[in-house]
Amino acid sequence: DGIWTQLIFTLVKNLATLWQSGDFQFLDHECHYRIKPTFRRLKWKYKGKFWCPSWTSITGRATKSSRSGAVEHSVRNFVGQAKSSGLITQRQAEQFISQYN
C-alpha cells in the first residue's frame, strides 16, 4: 500500500501549487482539478474534484474543511477507484513518482 500513498502525495504536491482549478498531465493523460469553496452550516468547506475525461469516467471527489484536504482526498478518491478498476498499475505509479522525486 506504500506505493499508492506515495502516488497520492506526489500528485497532491504538484496540484497544491494550483489555486482553484487547473490542468495536470498524469500518466500521459490530461486531467483536471477544481476546488470550490462552499458555505455549509455556518462554516467554509471546500469541494474538490479530480478527473481525466479523455482517459476514464472516474471522478475523484471530496468535501473537506481545508483546501489542501479537499485536494488530497479528491486525489485519494480518484487513485483508489483507478487502482480498483485496474486502470493504474503499480509500475505506472512507481514511474510517475520517480519523475518528481
Curated annotation (Swiss-Prot):
GO terms for biological process: defense response to bacterium. It comes from the Eukaryota. InterPro entries: Anti-LPS_factor/Scygonadin, Anti-LPS_factor/Scygonadin_sf. Keywords: Antibiotic, Antimicrobial, Disulfide bond. Pfam families: Anti-LPS-SCYG. Disulfide bonds join C31-C52. Binds tightly to LPS and thus specifically inhibits the LPS-mediated activation of the hemolymph coagulation. It has a strong antibacterial effect especially on the growth of Gram-negative bacteria. This is Anti-lipopolysaccharide factor. The lineage of its organism: Eukaryota, Metazoa, Ecdysozoa, Arthropoda, Chelicerata.
